[in-house]
Amino acid sequence: NTLYILALKEFNLEGFLNLVLWKPLKTIGKLLDFLDIKRVYYFFIPLFVLGFLAYKFKVDLPQQLISVLPEVFAFIGLVFVFKSFSERKSPFLAWILIVLNHFWIALAIVFNDKVSVSEIAFYLAGIILAGGIGYIALLQLKKIEMRILISQYLGHVYEHPKFAFFFLLATLGITGFPITSTFIGEDLIFSHIGSNQVILAFFVASSFVVSGIAGIRIYARLFLGPHVKTYHELPYKSS
């Protein structure tokens, strides 16, 4: 704790992280503002289905194409989590992008190496379960509150502690926390990336890291901070 405070005060750690990490992530995310729910549903999901069908006919594809598809699919997943991190309006879009990121990673890996169905199922089972729970929690919260944005801290844990708890579990689930099979599935994913495939490993690892940050950000914006309603006493920010 002493070293952390020293780093903040004397070495300007917070400003350094803001310069080299948070600002670049936000800048990249702003370049992806064209990504909305409609484009995800009408373009990228059909593109994923097309990629899955291409895998079924993998033997008929040129080897040059097969060799670059893993990096392409993993990059699409990385783009999704960048957009999720910078999203300031719809928590539904941010959540869906994190979930779909894992499906793009799975598609990249099946093109990259021979992977058993059980390994992919083990990896995606936790994502599907946690993603479903989180999406249902968002739907229920929207029914109650009508308007939920992630442009500010809403503090809904004050009125909805149960939603906050289940959404936190779902967030930990889709970010690979060791409460679902995805935690082990991520290790299985990396076992199918060669030691010479630096770009693919970078895309996948970066996706896991940024998706974790983006997921916790959604939870924090919806449930933490001062309560957006002012019918009760609120502490000053300085306190």
Residue positions per predicted region:
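Helix-coil boundary and interhelical linker segments in multi-pass alpha-helical membrane proteins
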Residues: 55-64, 107-121, 192-200
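Alpha-helical multi-pass transmembrane bundles of energy-transducing inner-membrane proteins
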Residues: 89-151
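Central hydrophobic cores of alpha-helical transmembrane segments in multi-pass inner-membrane proteins
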Residues: 26, 74-83, 130-139
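Interfacial and helix-entry/exit segments of alpha-helical transmembrane bundles
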Residues: 131-203, 208, 215, 232-239
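Membrane-water interface at transmembrane helix exits
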Residues: 22, 83, 109, 138-142, ...
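Divalent metal-coordination and catalytic microenvironments
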Residues: 21, 95, 153, 182, ...
